Amino acid sequence: MRLNTLSPAEGAKHSAKRLGRGIGSGLGKTGGRGHKGQKSRTGGGVRRGFEGGQMPLYRRLPKFGFTSMKAAVTAEVRLNDLAKVEGGVVTLESLKAANVITKDIQFVKIILAGEVKGAVVVRGLRVTKGAKAAIEAAGGSVEE
């Protein structure tokens, strides 16, 4: 094999459609745009959601709900991340110090994912039932 003999696999490359280059090409004259109408013109076409002047669906239907900003400052922490905290006492501040969560996080919930490496004391954090059972089984405790 030499560099000057390399070529793409058969059928891997498609030649571009050359529009408006004669009747024999199959794409001459109108170039696949049909006859007349807004979409046949240059720059023709309508914006997304436009329904020809009829009130569009996104405006016919009412607004609903909202986006909770609490979700942006809440994090889930896995059990195996608790091992990164030094001292064995897990609080919001100790998780931030260990770079398990970012500094803007205000609420944390510990979930049952991974395994607890040794006894830890969890203070002031929400904990799922399964995670609480796993922490207590490893000799740790959960304090509200």
From Swiss-Prot:
Annotated segments matching region Disordered: 1-53
InterPro entries named in the record: Ribosomal_uL15, Ribosomal_uL15/eL18, Ribosomal_uL15/eL18_sf, Ribosomal_uL15_bac-type, Ribosomal_uL15_CS
Key words of the record: Ribonucleoprotein, Ribosomal protein, RNA-binding, rRNA-binding
PROSITE patterns: RIBOSOMAL_L15
Gene3D superfamilies per record: 3.100.10.10
GO cellular component, one term: cytosolic large ribosomal subunit
Biased composition (Gly residues): 21-31
GO-annotated molecular function: rRNA binding; structural constituent of ribosome
One of the GO BP terms on file: translation
Pfam family, one: Ribosomal_L27A
Its job: Binds to the 23S rRNA.
Family per record: Belongs to the universal ribosomal protein uL15 family.
Assembly: Part of the 50S ribosomal subunit.
Listed name of the protein: Large ribosomal subunit protein uL15
The organism of origin for this protein: Pasteurella multocida (strain Pm70)
Gene name, Swiss-Prot/TrEMBL: rplO
